[in-house]
């Protein structure tokens, strides 16, 4: 590496490369050389491995072979996509000087830096998924977190109240790139993420952040955005903006505001609950059989992204929810007319971001034109609708007749992919361009006339006029007739059977045509930039329009889904109540081959907790999840899968359902479950919906039962949350007798011989048995094992009954974990004994039995 750093020992070109590389040491440097982007030294070695491209050498520099790898310029996006997916970044270095006037290496400079969180190119983005850049700040005062979607301009900040809240936000936003300060102490929280960027402390300075943000928004202070006093959030937001400016190296007019998020505005769903509910990602990491897979039939990518944001951030504002419900109800009558129009609108949101960054391609402008053409018809469809919310959306959508006229006049119907290909600007838009094009386009007629004239004058029937990319224009004659050509014909190329010539007249025309093509392309590029200048003053209203169009797509999609899937409009209330008649699981009912059994649920202050019993595979988890999903759907304004629903306002949705070992963190299944349970007990309120499934499994019977009992007590007596508590501890079914507000329900099953039929229907009261052996048989456990288990079960039950011993029962009035409790299990056992009737052998057996309890 020492020889690399001694630039004077290298060739001028390598000196230029090394100087540029020293300015960007942590990213790949793609160095433009002709038709290739080249990488050298360590960049070449790593790129060869990551991108599966050939590693070669480019001679020697300072006596050392130079490792080199390269990719053709026209497929650079494909390789950049691979890199950003791996969390890598790349600096793109272009030739900006004129080779004909350059002394030494052509001038080059880095024109942009492509990072996972700052990409806007269509080829690099997932079309139906937000791509976020995030920054996190931590100090003694607390935490700050900010996100920016550069492909839309959406800029958000918040101040998580604790570590768990930050963890929830990281899981919800899932940033592609995360910036953190040198002093950040919570490395364990982020170290497993890709795209981590350690940034200098000064980028998070509060005053620097204020200056950056005010400069971006053209304001004197940030009071109007409501973030002036949010110091922790501002630090994170300031670092984000600085980083984006450094990487994009252009103005960012589409980033127009910073919105401060408040926890109370949304229904909080922690990381574990979000995973368990499978909103947009299933437990295997895929997208199949998720809520989004059923609900998302949007026709624009920006609508799909907005719907997913709604699912991950349900809201609590009743006014907004009622407006959405009203709009959906109206759109049920016109959704079929709207969808074809919205489909042609396309991804206007991201097109506008590329316009703002001045990276929009010709086809982006053509798609923008197509979107504008749909707006009058969208207005026609919705003008008669009485929904106030739809009227508001229509006013925000607007119409852009002047811009539509500009794009119709300026851009050809089907433009090429890139402006450098030429042929983008329509004929008639610019007189000078048309003049130069006419000269170039007239070449065909001129060459035909020249060929006819020369063939006639020279009487050479094999004479032809043509063009070659290397040698230019030529007059071709067969070798057999070549002796007949006149003296002013100058030989240009000799082939096997023909000779090619040039004459002064053709050479003069060639120079004129080639000049005209270059001139026409130069004018086109200038006109293309002028079109940007004409469009950009409207970027604010265009962004408002695209956001409204995306919401219209979401609402019309929810209207169609409500019709197709037989959803009903829930009644929303501020009370702590959930009353659902004929509730269904939105995903299971669509993917199951069996008819789905709908079930009711009733939760209220007088009926706070349901103790749910029944067999495994009986439907307990489905019943619990469907309740949470129905409540979630109601809090995005959607209709819900039920016959009737009254949904009260909730502040949080917690689920403790299923778990697996966290091997990376060294945590057992039981530890994972207890961690999730602790989070619920610390953060749930009486306005929370809590789903608890099989608390206490994974440890001894008494430990597990004690934990389950204490959790149920705490949730019902102290927290008073609306709780669904599924369990196999039948002792818990006695809780309704001890605590008001707890009710038993069970999932019904029918057993006949060795077979069991799950009815999947919910009934009041506790289950009579667990059906564990029947479920084991259904799972394929060998019959001889089942028979032995049944025999052993009968023996155990007989032994307990014979000795007057029943299953343990825990009273609600005593703290379960009190060390000096007189109700210790051993004491309870001893109290059941009758020493006067026991033989010495019986007494010895009891001692052994008591030993096994420990």
Swiss-Prot record:
The keyword DNA-binding applies. It comes from the Bacteria. ATP binds at residues 614-621. Keywords: ATP-binding, DNA damage, DNA repair, DNA-binding, Nucleotide-binding. GO terms for molecular function: ATP binding; ATP-dependent DNA damage sensor activity; damaged DNA binding; mismatched DNA binding. One of its GO terms (cellular component) is cytosol. One of its GO terms (biological process) is mismatch repair. SUPFAM superfamilies: DNA repair protein MutS, domain I, DNA repair protein MutS, domain II, DNA repair protein MutS, domain III, P-loop containing nucleoside triphosphate hydrolases. Transmembrane segments: none annotated. This protein is involved in the repair of mismatches in DNA. It is possible that it carries out the mismatch recognition step. This protein has a weak ATPase activity. Belongs to the DNA mismatch repair MutS family. This is DNA mismatch repair protein MutS. The gene is mutS.
